[in-house]
């Protein structure tokens, strides 16, 4: 494509080249430089930057060479790189030959006569090759042809054979001309479009596209719409990751395989990059000119199907103040059938942008692309397996493919098949490959030495000691050669090993990636984890005293979920913990979060006393549009979306507004909830626990009844009666449809004196740990413990009075002693009680022979 530089650049260029004269001369020279491509212009700009960097007040052939290497993407740069020339090496060589300048550089840096000659020779080379543009390749050909400047010396010093380089460039120019299918005189019929797009048909011919499995129905519909006389523009609408772009690739593959009707034979499918089309349009009218040029080329070629991914970006693209956007420019051509265009966008973007513009909407024919099923995803993964095996150089087992489809469907709720399953296979393959590849120790040593040499060399260059720097450069080359030989040998050994015994991606590798993405343990149970799950009750009882019914129910639910036997469409379990205050309802939930979900912070705790008012209910799922906090998300939905494997605690559930219970119905039944932004949040891997104090009065009375009962059964009979009475009270407070969805209602027992004694042990142990961190060793006597239990036991209030007694009897006394300086770091203290039940603190070894609680 011929990129025309703006007039300002041309005038600046001619000034720098010291070209002066009458208007005729200006017009002639202007025409000469108008043929420079954007990349060639960039080379000239970079050459001036290189001159400034070196402190030179001229632009010579060497700066043009550095500009070619700095541009990096043109044919000339590719030709130099293929011969092992890098910008870094060239800069060092240039500095060795001409050194650095004084540092004073004029604003306008003139070109040397030899540099001017190179530009003229570049234009001459372009004319000889019958090209109507001057690119970076012509600049390099001119530089080689001139052959006597500093640039030529630099190339020769770096070991380049100039005639061989010239023949390489000519060959590369010939190859790029041949790539354009159906072109006349070696040029494409749609040069502008190919500059701003990607030819999918050509990529299909070269085998660069992934195979498209399934989607026959959608491709057939697209072909039907493309065959229409007018408004022949399908738009593929579907969720992100369902395979919309793959349908366009599938069409390109069908065209090259002659599996399309005669109306689509010999068509070229080209994707347009809208962002690239807009990029660089600094002046008004440039964008419109590019787009009109593309439309004219498509109209003239008459064999192009344009694909615009993210088609909603057309709306507003290029629309500066008072200008027309891309969508409005394309509308007439889309309606008349002059332009066959396949668009692709998501449901949300289609609704937000295209449906608003009725005139644009009627020009596109919607084709809905649904998410494939798990079975279809497995087939898609099998079709792609060869590509991923070749890329990662390993084998992907059938079990890994099935696991990727099933586990991604079950555990990754916020993305869509097949994209999430493909990503799982890709990342698992990458992980297996990395685990099987390690650098040899000798290579690591050489790499460290190379970095050290390069650091010293760069310091010497900065200080101007080029002679010594050249010695280090020679050493650098030696180390690089050694490393290359070592790496080559290692690579060959690895390739040989991989060819004989390629690593295999299996089900466990996929499960590990799912776990790392979501935090949900889905890998196979290890022996230690199985033991941990089997003895779960014992683990919980180390922190929770009594309450066997609750501990057993929770443990069973966790075991079911971890083994994979739970219902995949419901939460792990849902419980109502009812009972008197202070008996361990919330503590059990904390213990479970700590031991089996990673930490206490893994628990999502919602104090329902904060949701007593009707207007606070929306805080759970997020504020509606137009209200404060709309963009912040819901306190419940956002917490579960970020951590899908967790315990959700609704503390003091009876204090919530009744609307909260309506919100919980679909969570309890289907394990899902839609937030204020329309996103579906997955609760299928959460454990839901609701605590309640309903029935506290009944529990306080212990459900006592009339009649005679055996002494050994009295406690169980009282508990049974109490549980029935609590259930009756719950039925009076909660609606039947809410209670019916809860898995189990667990009534906590009142704490006995022995259980309070055990809780005292746990609380004292925690205090000992806190004091130990300050360097103080603490012990208590049996007398003190008896006093603590006597003052802290209250059946109606559970363990909380014990905590208050502990603060009053132990912590307050101890704090006073520490502040007064009587107890210092390194001391041993013992807490005892005298005859008047007054707490006393003894230091050091005591003669009292009381038993200590450790």
Curated annotation (Swiss-Prot):
Region (Repeat 1): 36-101
PROSITE patterns in the cross-refs: CLP_R, CLPAB_1, CLPAB_2, UVR
Pfam families: AAA, AAA_2, AAA_lid_9, Clp_N, ClpB_D2-small
Main location per the UniProt record: plastid
SUPFAM superfamilies: Double Clp-N motif, P-loop containing nucleoside triphosphate hydrolases
CDD domains associated with the record: AAA, RecA-like_ClpB_Hsp104-like
Chloroplast as UniProt keyword: yes
Single Gene Ontology BP annotation: cellular response to heat
Keywords noted in UniProt: ATP-binding, Chaperone, Chloroplast, Nucleotide-binding, Plastid, Repeat
Gene3D superfamilies membership: 1.10.8.60, Clp, N-terminal domain (1.10.1780.10), P-loop containing nucleotide triphosphate hydrolases (3.40.50.300), UVR domain (4.10.860.10)
Record region (Repeat 2): 111-175
Domain UVR residues, every copy: 447-482
Localization per Swiss-Prot or TrEMBL: Plastid, Chloroplast
Residues that hold ATP according to the record: 238-245, 579-586
Residue ranges constituting the Clp R domain according to the UniProt record: 33-175
GO molecular function: ATP binding; ATP hydrolysis activity
Protein function: May interact with a ClpP-like protease involved in degradation of denatured proteins in the chloroplast.
Family: Belongs to the ClpA/ClpB family.
Protein name: ATP-dependent Clp protease ATP-binding subunit ClpA homolog
Organism: Cyanidium caldarium (Red alga)
Lineage, broadest ranks: Eukaryota, Rhodophyta, Bangiophyceae, Cyanidiales, Cyanidiaceae
Gene: clpC
């Amino acid at each position: 494509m011929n990129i025309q530089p703006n007039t300002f650049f041309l005038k600046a260029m001619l000034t720098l080249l010291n070209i002066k004269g009458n208007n005729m001369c200006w017009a002639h020279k202007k025409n000469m430089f108008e043929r420079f491509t954007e990349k060639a212009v960039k080379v000239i700009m970079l050459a001036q930057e290189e001159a400034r960097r070196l402190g030179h007040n001229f632009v010579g052939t060497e700066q043009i060479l550095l500009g070619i290497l700095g541009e990096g993407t043109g044919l000339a740069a590719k030709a130099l790189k293929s011969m092992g020339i890098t910008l870094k090496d060239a800069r060092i060589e240039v500095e060795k030959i001409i050194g650095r300048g004084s540092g004073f550089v004029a604003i306008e840096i003139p070109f040397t006569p030899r540099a001017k000659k190179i530009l003229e020779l570049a234009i001459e080379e372009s004319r000889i090759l019958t090209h109507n543009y001057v690119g970076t390749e012509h600049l390099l050909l001119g530089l080689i042809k001139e052959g006597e400047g500093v640039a030529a010396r630099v190339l020769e010093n770096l070991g380049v054979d100039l005639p061989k380089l010239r023949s390489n460039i000519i060959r590369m120019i010939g190859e790029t001309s041949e790539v354009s299918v159906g072109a006349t005189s070696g040029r494409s019929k749609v040069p502008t479009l190919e500059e701003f797009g990607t030819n999918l048909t050509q990529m299909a011919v070269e085998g660069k596209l992934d195979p498209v499995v399934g989607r026959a129905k959608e491709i057939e519909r697209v072909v039907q719409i493309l065959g229409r006389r007018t408004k022949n523009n399908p738009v593929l609408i579907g969720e992100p990751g369902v395979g919309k772009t793959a349908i366009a690739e599938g069409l390109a593959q069908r065209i090259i395989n002659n599996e399309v009707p005669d109306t689509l034979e010999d068509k070229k499918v080209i994707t347009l990059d809208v962002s690239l089309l807009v990029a660089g349009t600094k002046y008004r009218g440039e964008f419109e000119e590019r787009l009109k040029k593309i439309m004219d080329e498509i109209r003239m070629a008459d064999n192009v199907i344009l694909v615009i991914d993210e088609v909603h970006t057309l709306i507003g693209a290029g629309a500066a103040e008072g200008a027309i956007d891309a969508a409005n420019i394309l509308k007439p051509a889309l309606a008349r059938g002059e332009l066959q265009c396949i668009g692709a966008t998501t449901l949300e973007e289609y609704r937000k942008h295209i449906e608003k513009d009725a005139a644009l909407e009627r020009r596109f024919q919607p084709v809905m692309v649904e998410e494939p099923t798990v079975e279809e995803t497995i087939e898609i993964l099998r079709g792609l397996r060869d590509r991923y095996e070749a890329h990662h150089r390993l084998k992907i087992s059938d079990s890994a493919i099935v696991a990727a489809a099933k586990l991604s469907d079950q555990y990754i709720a916020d993305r869509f098949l097949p994209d999430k399953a493909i990503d799982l296979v890709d990342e698992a393959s990458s992980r297996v490959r990395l685990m099987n590849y390690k650098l040899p120790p000798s290579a690591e040593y050489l790499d460290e030495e190379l970095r050290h040499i390069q650091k010293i060399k760069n310091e010497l260059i900065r200080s101007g000691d080029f002679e010594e720097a050249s010695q280090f450069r020679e050493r650098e080359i030696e180390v690089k050669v050694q490393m290359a030989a070592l790496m080559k040998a290692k690579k060959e050994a690895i390739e040989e090993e991989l060819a004989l015994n390629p690593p295999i991606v299996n089900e466990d590798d996929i499960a590990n990636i799912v776990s790392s993405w979501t935090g949900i343990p889905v890998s196979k149970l290890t022996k230690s984890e199985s033991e941990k799950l089997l003895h779960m009750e014992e683990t919980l009882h180390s922190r929770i005293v009594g309450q066997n019914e609750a501990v057993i129910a929770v443990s069973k639910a966790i075991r079911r979920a971890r083994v994979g036997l739970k219902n995949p469409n419901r939460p792990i379990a849902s419980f109502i913990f009812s009972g008197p205050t202070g008996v361990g309802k919330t503590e059990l939930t904390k213990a479970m979060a700590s031991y089996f979900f990673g930490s206490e912070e893994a628990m999502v705790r919602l104090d329902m006393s904060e949701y007593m008012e009707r207007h606070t209910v929306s805080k759970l799922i997020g504020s509606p549009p137009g209200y404060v906090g709309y963009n912040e998300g819901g306190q419940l939905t956002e917490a579960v979306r970020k951590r899908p494997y967790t315990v959700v605690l609704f503390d003091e559930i009876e204090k919530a507004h009744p609307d909260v219970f309506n919100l919980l119905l679909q969570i309890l039944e289907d394990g899902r909830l839609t937030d204020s932004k329309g996103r579906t949040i997955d609760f299928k891997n959460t454990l839901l626990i609701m605590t309640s104090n309903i029935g506290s009065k009944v529990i306080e009375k212990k459900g006592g009844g009339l009649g005679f009962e055996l002494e050994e059964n009295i406690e169980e009979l009282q508990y049974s009666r109490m549980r029935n009475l609590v259930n009756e009270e719950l039925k009076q407070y909660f609606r039947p449809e809410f209670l019916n969805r809860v898995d189990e209602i667990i009534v906590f027992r009142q704490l006995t004196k022995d259980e309070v004694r055990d809780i005292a042990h746990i609380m004292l142990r925690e205090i000992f740990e806190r004091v130990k961190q300050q360097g103080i060793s603490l012990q208590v006597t049996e007398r003190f413990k008896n006093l603590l239990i006597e003052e802290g036991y209250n059946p109606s209030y559970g363990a909380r009075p014990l905590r208050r007694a502990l603060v009053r009897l132990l912590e307050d006394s101890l704090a006073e002693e520490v502040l007064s300086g009587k107890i210092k770091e390194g001391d041993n203290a013992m807490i005892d009680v005298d005859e008047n039940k007054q707490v006393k603190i003894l230091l050091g070894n005591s003669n009292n022979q009381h038993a200590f609680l450790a």
